[in-house]
């Protein structure tokens, strides 16, 4: 069961695919594992799978028969820009949280302004935009998982594509991911799982090469 506020647009389609990514991961975890291992390898890995599923509408042919060619091409071209933007915004959010815990007496609006200039090259007046980030309260210190997941998902997807082709067009994709990723749950540490799956150590180079 998924709780999500959806409307008829691509952002909601991304959201739905993202949450379904979490679902298929959880469903694929072996029930024969010890109870404490019946969860994702790490928050970053389950986010990587979810983010990869969210990206499917831009990196595979899911919408080819639905959206006009010219519009679809422009839509897919936004993917790299979105990826670069996400990295910059993530670094802003993560750095702000670290700095505010290090020195909680400082002015958060001033800190946000300085970091916005550093990471986004954005000059803005001091305000409380930082307070609009729900993760600071709901999931403290969690955003670094999204950042690492954004790197992991590319390495995972590139490997899956090398074996399966477009994963949405290969009926063996679900079985392959169940067998090689999901079923292990938390019995394998996140970086060990990446290496076992792809044959290579976790690296940001795969993400950088995609930009």
Predicted regions and their residues:
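Short pre-active-site segment immediately N-terminal to the catalytic Zn-binding motif
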Residues: 1-17
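Catalytic Zn2+-binding segment of zinc metalloproteases
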Residues: 20-33, 57
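Short, glycine/acidic-rich hinge or "gate" loops at secondary-structure transitions
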Residues: 32-38, 63-71, 164-171
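Post-HExxH zinc-binding segment in Zn-dependent metallohydrolases
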Residues: 40-75
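Active-site-proximal binding-pocket segments
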Residues: 57-61, 79, 91-95, 99
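C-terminal, non-catalytic "cap/extension" segments appended to globular domains
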Residues: 16, 24, 52, 74, ...
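Active-site metal-coordination segments of metallo-dependent hydrolases
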Residues: 36-49, 82-85, 140-146
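Short beta-alpha connecting loops at secondary-structure transitions
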Residues: 2-3, 34-41, 76-81, 134
